[in-house]
Design a protein with these regions (language model features):
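N-terminal loops that bind phosphate or other acidic moieties
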Residues: 4-195
């Protein structure tokens, strides 16, 4: 005798293998039809954040992590925008080329997306911070957004799942971006000067 249940399926992605939506659908398929299933994929601010908000409905060509042009998807609904840093400044954009460059990688393209969202009328911008190739502390993004006074009347929020200190980011995330011990020390010093 089986009991009826309400089931909420709310996973994040399995990084590098399957999206949160695909995980949700796979779990739902395995659950008995006798139960009421609600699917609500989640994201941690990294890759997949844009998908959770309905996917991109805009495409912009911006600077990739090493300055090369990349097509980056983002979302604009009315006056609200969602930008996923990984779309413009993502580590996967460099890894596809089989090399990394943790010193020169920049968030400039993410700033270009933020600037574009502002120019298209966004007043509330959410930026998902995960999956970047850069340890520039957001300096590249700020340079692309100039003049910064244009942003004084809008709200920009960030989504991330870590509480790592600003300077400690180099030591924690530098290795996954290909940084050597010497490069990590350089990145920490650069972040310290920026702070």
């Amino acid at each position: 005798d089986r009991k009826y249940m309400k089931v909420l399926i709310a996973p994040d992605k399995f990084k590098g293998t399957i999206s949160a939506t695909e995980v949700s659908q796979s779990i739902a398929e395995a659950i008995d039809d006798l139960h009421e299933v609600t699917i609500q994929p989640l994201a941690d601010g990294g890759e997949g954040t844009l998908e959770i908000f309905g996917g991109g409905n805009k495409m912009s060509v911006v600077s990739g992590p090493l300055g090369e042009p990349v097509s980056a998807s983002w979302r604009l609904d009315g006056k609200s925008a969602v930008i996923e840093m990984a779309q413009a400044s993502g580590l996967h954009l460099i890894q596809e080329k089989c090399f990394t460059n943790p010193i020169d990688a920049s968030t400039f393209g993410t700033g270009e997306l933020i600037r574009t969202a502002l120019e298209r009328g966004a007043e509330d911008i959410l930026v998902g911070l995960g999956g970047s190739a850069s340890t520039d502390g957001g300096l590249g993004a700020l340079q692309a957004m100039r003049p910064l006074k244009r942003y004084s009347s809008i709200e920009i929020n960030v989504a991330c799942d870590v509480q790592t200190g600003f300077i400690e980011c180099a030591g924690i995330f530098g290795p996954q971006k290909g940084a050597t011990d010497t490069q990590i020390r350089f990145l920490e010093n650069r972040l310290r000067r920026l702070a």
